[in-house]
């Protein structure tokens, strides 16, 4: 993005910063949303938002669209990071939960490690790293379809937490 749009270092660094900014702004509201609509629907919403974010650069590779795309990626990441572990707790029994969470973190670390390598391979193979967007869009779409087809019985919350109660945990 930096080279494509001739951005300075400080402007180019806004892209990854936006992902973290959205996590800061939306993590507590996401937990409140999750309490209202459930973990599965929140994870599904995160995958749909991520898929939309990955589709935008395919339609229009412009600086403005990349800003929107990275913002949506940050929002999607926030939703999934807040809601995925509670969803897993509804699926995996208590004695296997810790190892399942650890395995999930390991897989996330591997994916983060492989991302730049895959981008480099796409660049070498096809001459353009932008082919990552449709590939990851397809992965997100398949994930959304798969999750929407599965029924998960979620534990009901006795009461919803207020914004201030969530904030007091920090």
Located regions from the model:
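Residue-level signature of mid-helix packing/kink "hotspots" within the transmembrane helices
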Residues: 20-28, 113
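Helix-loop-helix hairpin linking two adjacent transmembrane segments in secondary transporters
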Residues: 100-152
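Juxtamembrane intracellular "pre-TM" segments in multi-pass secondary transporters
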Residues: 154-170
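Short hydrophobic/aromatic, small-residue-rich stretches within specific transmembrane helices
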Residues: 13-20
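Conserved MFS/SLC helix-loop-helix module at the cytosolic interface between two early adjacent transmembrane helices
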Residues: 25-64
């Amino acid at each position: 993005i930096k080279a494509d749009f001739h951005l300075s270092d400080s402007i180019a660094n806004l892209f990854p910063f936006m992902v973290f900014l959205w996590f800061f702004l939306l993590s507590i509201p996401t937990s409140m949303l999750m309490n209202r609509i459930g973990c599965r629907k929140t994870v599904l919403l995160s995958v749909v938002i991520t898929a939309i974010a990955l589709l935008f650069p395919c339609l229009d590779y412009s600086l403005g669209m990349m800003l929107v795309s990275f913002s949506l990626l940050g929002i999607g990441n926030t939703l999934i990071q807040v809601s995925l572990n509670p969803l897993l707790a509804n699926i995996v029994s208590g004695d296997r939960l810790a190892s399942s969470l650890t395995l999930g973190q390991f897989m996330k670390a591997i994916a983060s490690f492989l991302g730049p390598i895959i981008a480099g391979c796409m660049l070498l193979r096809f001459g353009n790293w932008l082919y990552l967007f449709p590939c990851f869009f397809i992965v997100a779409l398949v994930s959304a379809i798969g999750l929407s087809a599965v029924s998960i019985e979620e534990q009901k919350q006795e009461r919803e937490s207020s914004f201030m109660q969530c904030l007091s945990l920090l």
